[in-house]
Amino acid sequence: MEGQGVGRTLRLLRNRLPRLRAGQSQNNPGEAVTEPERIQEHSPSSFAGGQHFFEYLLVVSLKKKRLGDDYEPTITYQFPKRENLLRGQQEEEDRLLSAIPLFCFPDGNEWAPLTEYPRETFSFVLTNVDGSRKIGYCRRLLPAGPGPQLPKVYCIISCIGCFGLFSKILDEVEKRHQISMAVIYPFMQGLREAAFPAPGKTVTLKSFIPDSGTEFISLTRPLDSHLEHVDFSVLLHCLHLEQIIQIFASAVLERKIIFLAEGLSTLSQCIHAAAALLYPFSWAHTYIPVVPESLLATVCCPTPFMVGVQMRFLQEVMDSPMEEVLLVNLCEGTFLLSVGDEKDILPPKLQDDILDSLGQGINELKTSEQINEHVSGPFVQFFVKTVGHYASYIKREASGQGHFQERSFCKAVTSKTKRRFVKKFVKTQLFSLFIQEAEKSRNPPAGYFQKKILEYEEQKKQKKSRERL
């Protein structure tokens, strides 16, 4: 029966969500929500599917079912409406639009009108059949008006990973929603016509609001764009540094990781942050920041996954048949389940280096950009020290096609503890996908990771020069 339950879940994923591209993650049949935002060295541009900030603005509302007292999430507003689509495009859009309500209300269908409800900002990721990714940026709140109300969700679907910027856009949408839906339309139309700014640049929109007059809204993209899709502060607030390192170690070996929290915002931000620690590598397995109630059987899957589950479903999760899972309680800052060897996965010296770097001056950080850089840096440095020499072990044919020399690459690591780790890591999909891209490219991508590799190599040269003196 357990296998049948998982099978039903996977079939539902296939039917409700956009299909995966051929050849992706073959050990995850039916997987549809995959891969975090920071997919490649040029992450932000890998999402940019043209000039538009976004593809859709959707309003998802709760509508009572014909039978019973349950409610069903339904799209009640869509901008823009797509017309004259080809048959394949129409089918793809229909799959996308049928999946979105499920992720806007992942906590089930048992609702009642409310007089108070704390607004929530969260996100989800969908992968299309062609490999392009769409992010849903969501703001869930109570509509304006007298008496009890059912919450609704404003959901912006975009190909661009820039969470801080879209959070500000949702603030503007929320401000207008309190007046009228008619006020939202011209703002979103202006946004749709604006060009997405380059790193460090600003786009300014002119918008008219009744009783307030004309407003100018500035949307600025962070100068350092490689971390613009994530915010590490919530993860730091929920967990100790040692726990974050153990989660990283589990993810590096592509294990099953479940995050538990009460709020959707906490869940989605923490799981995005955990996946971002893997940079420049990509989580290539099931990845669902907030698992809808109807898909809870995902936690029984035998293949690797990184998922977020609301605390209200804790008992269902604990009653599910699971093996070798790291179950993280973000509310209490504890591990409810673990494999037991999480502290021993990384080379001890490098693990201590990460911990020391994270702890230095962490209380003096003020802005989210400072926090992001401080947290990400030690993990990037870990990969620089363990596998940063990869480019030297790609032999190229005359055509330019490269072939990775795995055995020589591993032998080049002089430290026994490092080599033991590297031999395991090269067998993961994280590393395999990264190397496949590197084999295709004649030169390493001139991005943040390559910059850190070159800095590290220069430091080693300078150290050797000093030792000779």
Swiss-Prot record:
InterPro entries: cDENN_dom, dDENN_dom, DENN_C, DENN_domain_containing_2, Tripartite_DENN, uDENN_dom. GO terms for molecular function: guanyl-nucleotide exchange factor activity. Residues 226-359 form the cDENN domain. SMART domains: dDENN, DENN, uDENN. Residues 361-445 form the dDENN domain. It is found in: Cytoplasm. Pfam families: dDENN (PF03455), DENN (PF02141), uDENN (PF03456). One of its GO terms (cellular component) is nucleoplasm. The keyword Cytoplasm applies. Residues 17-44 are annotated as: Disordered. Keywords: Cytoplasm, Guanine-nucleotide releasing factor. Residues 55-204 form the uDENN domain. PANTHER family: DENN DOMAIN-CONTAINING PROTEIN 2, DENN DOMAIN-CONTAINING PROTEIN 2D. Guanine nucleotide exchange factor (GEF) which may activate RAB9A and RAB9B. Promotes the exchange of GDP to GTP, converting inactive GDP-bound Rab proteins into their active GTP-bound form. This is DENN domain-containing protein 2D.
